[in-house]
């Protein structure tokens, strides 16, 4: 039986491959650590990061000690949507990065979806 880490890596590579072969849009990539959550809008054709937001940002960091929770994920989603809107980005592809679409990932996506079309 495969370990959880191998399953995660396989799921991540499968998702990334589907996104890269089917879409020419920029992608909204999510990363979760044990304490923080990060979101980036990446243009793979130019290999640049257009916008980023995380729980390490001063606007979000001042709210709670526990940083990787649903309330802060919503704030990160709103912040990345605001930065994308100011950069002129209207559509992205959501790259959940191998994480299950549940909890903080879902909260971040729903908050970002208010201003950005997925």
From Swiss-Prot:
Q: Name one GO molecular function term.
A: 5S rRNA binding
Q: Which GO terms describe its cellular component?
A: cytosolic large ribosomal subunit
**InterPro entries listed in its UniProt record:** Ribosomal_uL18_bac-type (IPR004389), Ribosomal_uL18_bac/euk (IPR005484)
Gene3D superfamilies per record: 3.30.420.100
Pfam families, per database record: Ribosomal_L18p
According to its UniProt entry, the protein's GO biological process terms are: translation
Give the protein's function: This is one of the proteins that bind and probably mediate the attachment of the 5S RNA into the large ribosomal subunit, where it forms part of the central protuberance.
Q: How does it assemble?
A: Part of the 50S ribosomal subunit; part of the 5S rRNA/L5/L18/L25 subcomplex. Contacts the 5S and 23S rRNAs.
- Which protein are we looking at? Large ribosomal subunit protein uL18
- Organism field: Rickettsia felis (strain ATCC VR-1525 / URRWXCal2)
Q: What is the lineage of its organism?
A: Bacteria, Pseudomonadati, Pseudomonadota, Alphaproteobacteria, Rickettsiales
């Amino acid at each position: 039986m495969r370990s959880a880490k191998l399953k995660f890596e396989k799921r991540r590579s499968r998702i990334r491959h589907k996104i890269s072969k089917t879409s020419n849009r920029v992608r909204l990539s999510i990363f979760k650590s044990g304490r923080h959550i990060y979101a980036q809008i990446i243009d793979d054709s130019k290999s640049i990061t257009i916008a980023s937001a995380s729980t390490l940002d001063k606007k979000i960091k001042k709210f709670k000690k526990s940083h990787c929770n649903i309330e802060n994920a919503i704030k990160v989603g709103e912040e990345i949507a605001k930065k994308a809107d100011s950069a002129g980005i209207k559509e992205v592809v959501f790259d959940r990065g191998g994480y299950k679409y549940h909890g903080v990932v879902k909260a971040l996506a729903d908050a970002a979806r208010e201003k950005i079309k997925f």
